């Protein structure tokens, strides 16, 4: 039972055994159907070992996500689906509006819901566009970088929502990461908006 003191210890042992057995697919489909009988506790009986279970976790979040407090959901995901937990970790922009916006955005994306208060915030920002003066322009940020012996890796269409995940993975790998978030000119498509490449003319990329 989820209320047993040794539940998570048994959970980890079972997860290891399943990995050693090769996560038998013959039983996985029926298990994922039956486990939904656990209701709001379903997620505690799933692992991230296989794509099927990961998809079942998202099906659970769609159905029961709003029934769990965010901090409780985060605690469970840290054990059940660490990568998803890392995705939901906050990235601190140093601005309350951006911090809250992206945390709410990621949470709603994961539970597959759009909450009314978030819609109101989006509509409000569509008019105010406060992010335009909260964040520095990309050109000025890049010009301030030390580009000597730099290597440039360009990742197109990677959302800022992944910064919390990236920093968490860097910590796991004992890597040092320094991130500067900026705003680009519209349209942001690469073919029309890549003036920054000129600043890295001598860099490797």
Predicted regions mapped to residue ranges:
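…; additionally, a secondary subgroup of soluble metalloenzymes is captured
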Residues: 1-150, 157-205
């Amino acid at each position: 039972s989820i209320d047993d003191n040794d539940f998570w210890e048994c959970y980890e042992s079972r997860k290891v055994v399943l990995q050693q057995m090769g996560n038998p697919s013959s039983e996985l489909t029926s298990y994922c159907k039956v486990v939904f009988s656990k209701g709001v506790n379903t997620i505690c009986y799933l692992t991230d070992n296989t794509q099927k279970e990961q998809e079942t976790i998202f099906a659970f979040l769609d159905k029961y996500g709003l029934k769990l407090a965010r901090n409780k959901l985060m605690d469970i995901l840290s054990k059940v689906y660490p990568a998803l937990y890392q995705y939901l970790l906050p990235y601190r922009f140093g601005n309350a509006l951006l911090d809250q916006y992206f945390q709410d955005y990621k949470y709603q994306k994961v539970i597959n819901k759009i909450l009314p208060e978030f819609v109101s915030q989006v509509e409000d920002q569509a008019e105010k566009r406060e992010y335009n003066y909260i964040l520095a322009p990309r050109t000025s940020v890049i010009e301030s970088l030390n580009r000597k012996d730099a290597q440039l890796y360009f990742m197109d269409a990677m959302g800022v929502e992944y910064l919390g995940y990236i920093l968490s993975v860097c910590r796991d790998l004992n890597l040092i990461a320094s991130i500067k978030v900026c705003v680009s000119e519209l349209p942001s498509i690469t073919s029309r908006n890549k003036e920054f490449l000129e600043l890295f003319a001598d860099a490797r990329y």
